[in-house]
């Protein structure tokens, strides 16, 4: 076909056909602060229960701090841990990103919890079956025995969701024996 004919055919096509989403496209994930808090606590505490450590409590302060960093990433497009001096001593941090609106909070946390498949008991950072502690770092922060609080937040750019969880006291400390404490 000639390019001019293709252009004419494209211009003659109904605009609505190009703008309507496919019926096979997934519906946007449910969102909201109450759902975020409920989903996050449920997913974290299920993982902690399986590991044999006490439940986490929600921290509004940690959630507010997480929101600041999530917004920063959404505004700048720079994905990475908060580099604010002293933040690491104050709170642990887990990050996730994905296509805007497609993933539920359960999926966001579930990706982190799924790292359990690579976990092996040991002295941190030697706690990964693969030899790479970063492949279990989200999971180990979630189940870290001395962590008592979590707060998470979500911010979005035009295309990307940025999800941040903060933990206190922070986990993933070198030299700490980390083993499941199932009864």
Placement of each model-derived feature along the sequence:
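Short, glycine-/polar-rich solvent-exposed loops and beta-turns at beta-strand/coil boundaries
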Residues: 59, 85-88
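Sec-dependent N-terminal signal peptides
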Residues: 4-12
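A short alpha-helix/helix-coil micro-patch that ends at or immediately precedes a cysteine
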Residues: 21-78
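Boundary at the C-terminal end of the N-terminal hydrophobic targeting segment
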Residues: 15-19
């Amino acid at each position: 076909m000639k390019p001019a004919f293709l252009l004419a055919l494209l211009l003659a096509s109904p605009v609505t056909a190009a703008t309507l989403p496919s019926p096979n496209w997934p519906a946007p994930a449910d969102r909201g602060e109450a759902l975020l808090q409920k989903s996050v606590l449920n997913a974290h505490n299920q993982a902690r229960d399986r590991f044999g450590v006490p439940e986490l409590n929600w921290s509004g302060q940690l959630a507010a701090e997480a929101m600041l960093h999530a917004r920063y990433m959404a505004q700048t497009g720079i994905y990475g841990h908060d580099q604010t001096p002293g933040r690491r001593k104050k709170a642990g941090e887990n990050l996730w990103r994905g296509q805007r609106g497609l993933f539920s909070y359960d999926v966001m946390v579930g990706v982190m919890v799924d790292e359990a498949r690579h976990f092996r008991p040991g002295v941190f950072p030697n706690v990964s079956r693969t030899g790479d502690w970063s492949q279990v770092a989200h999971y180990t922060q979630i189940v870290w025995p001395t962590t008592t609080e979590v707060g998470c937040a979500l911010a979005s750019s035009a295309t990307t969701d940025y999800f941040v969880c903060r933990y206190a006291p922070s986990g993933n400390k070198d030299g700490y024996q980390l083993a499941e404490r199932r009864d």
